[in-house]
Amino acid sequence: MKNNLNYLKNNLNLCGYTLLRVTNNKILIFKSFYKYTKCIYVSYFDTSIEVKIDKVFDTEVYPEYIERLMITKKCFDSIYDSLWYIQRSILI
């Protein structure tokens, strides 16, 4: 489990994003923009990797709108597929 998260950490091109290890089986990748923060949550389970992508909006800029928009949630069986998906999400 720890080796898979280390593999992701070592092989991701973060492009200005920040990577934090939250627990032994979870990492958070985020970057703040003017109106929102893009967050990518990666959780490793026994047989799968779950990737969630959120946009968290600044409520001072948009006080009448939603605070959080969950864009996608995907589960992967392969570390390589999850790496490709996370890297693509960072670049978009």
What is each stretch, according to the model?
Residues 36-46:
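Broad, structure-driven detector of short, well-ordered beta-strand segments within folded domains
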